[in-house]
Amino acid sequence: MSIPNGKNVYGYADAYAKLANFGQQHLLKYYDELDEAQRAALLNQIEQIDFSVVSTNKQPEKRGRITPIGVTELAEIRTRGDEFFDAGMAELRAGHVGAVLLAGGMGTRLGSDAPKGAFNIGIKRELYIFECLINNLLNVAERVGSFVHLFIMTSDKNDAATRAFFAEHNYFGYAAEFVHFFTQETAPAADYNGKVYLEEKYRLATSPNGNGGWYSSMAKHGMLDIVRRNGIEWLNVFAVDN
């Protein structure tokens, strides 16, 4: 398919060529109706998005082979509980353990338009979900004599608000240099035929890639460099509402 005539705006040809590789040229159908700022926003989004994700999702499903993983049964935990605890504490003292908090959600179902972790659950005093989680980490830090690196996954919707909330509350007493924010990746939203939706004439529809994407999101935002630089070997991953 040839590129339509009259499109001389910088970046259009590159965007069209990229979309053509994935059969997504329809995303430029309203280009002539956009102002310069909207055109720039659309072209930038097209440049940033990995459309191969959509192509991969269109592949026929293959039956997987599920192999049971080894488990530690309750009887063994009761017998070796002290041993396991001491091993964990040793790794913490050595600085080998980091924490990953999945906090990309908003408090909509709680009746709040703030990040879910900023919800006040206190009865007699203010007590925030983030505060409870930080208190748990402070307890660990006190026992092992050092802070644990905390990686907080936010989303495009609540990143700025989450950072501001922590700053406003002075990180609830936690060392700010041990707290690292990164945003959750998004993926283009498509119909059953693999065609990506337009949310607006100048903006593609995207949605978060789910909690399962925490590792790739960490990698994209350079968090794994911090992990390696600090000798972290274990990551404890938990959600803000669990």
Where are these regions (language model features)?
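Basic/polar N-terminal segments that are highly enriched at the extreme N-terminus
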Residues: 1-17
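Domain-scale recognition of functional cores that engage charged ligands
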Residues: 25, 74-98, 112-242
